[in-house]
A protein has these predicted regions:
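Juxtadomain low-complexity/linker regions and immediately adjacent membrane-anchoring helices
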Residues: 1-27
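Residue-level detector of buried hydrophobic side-chain packing
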Residues: 65, 77-79, 93, 144, ...
Length: 216
């Protein structure tokens, strides 16, 4: 299976506030990083109690893959992330629109196709995974099968952009029942070599067109 590795502009964008809506619905994040090799809070929706107010944290990770060499819609594909430290968050892969070639900026925090403030976006976004990721290895690759929409975009777009987002609170817009440990970590493309880089592994489609020749 060929591999397409994430570009080095991948990374995370975080937002924090004293209210859930203030963190989750920000247009611009409060911090970002597209140069680290790995992070412990790559995807996060957590709450830290405090006085006079608690602090809510939302972190999303963004990736892009050069798919310009994919001519035909793949027969199948998997996105793979090497885990790091915690693995408590339930995750979705969704289509995104962040800039490429300039590094992630805090202004990319809400660059999710179909996303919107103050709403449950599970039905609004373009989902790329076949199923929700509910388990996360912190010492190996986490393999996530991609759906037909992702396969079509691999063939139809020169760059496949996506966001790894927490499902239960962030994507669903639900600030209830949050805790201090709901986050998952992973490695990014800035790690030396490609051993732990995020990647898409895919099965190519063979062109089965049949040509009939004739002598005239």
């Amino acid at each position: 299976m060929p591999n397409i590795y994430s570009g080095t502009d991948d990374g995370w964008i975080a937002a924090e506030d004293t209210t859930f809506a203030g963190a989750r619905d920000r247009v611009t994040g409060t911090s970002s990083d597209s140069t680290s090799t790995r992070d412990s809070f790559s995807v996060r929706a957590s709450l830290t109690p405090g006085r006079p107010a608690p602090t809510y944290y939302i972190t999303r990770s963004f990736f892009y893959f050069d798919t310009s060499s994919v001519v035909y819609t793949p027969a199948s594909a998997e996105m793979k992330f090497f885990g790091n430290v915690n693995g408590a968050a339930d995750l979705k892969i969704v289509k995104s629109t962040q800039g490429v070639g300039v590094g992630l900026a805090t202004s990319d925090f809400d660059s999710i196709t179909g996303g919107g403030a103050g709403a449950d976006n599970t039905s609004n976004v373009t989902v790329y995974d076949l199923a929700t990721t509910t388990t996360w290895s912190t010492s190996g690759f986490n393999t996530i099968p991609l759906n037909a929409t992702a396969l079509q975009d691999m063939a139809g777009e020169d760059t496949l952009k996506c966001c790894l987002i927490e499902l239960d609170h962030d994507l669903r817009n639900d600030g209830t029942g949050m805790n201090t440990t709901n986050y998952s970590g992973l490695w990014y493309a800035d790690a030396i070599g490609t051993l732990k880089d995020p990647r898409i592994s895919y099965t190519e489609t063979v062109d089965n067109a049949v040509f009939f020749g004739a002598n005239f």
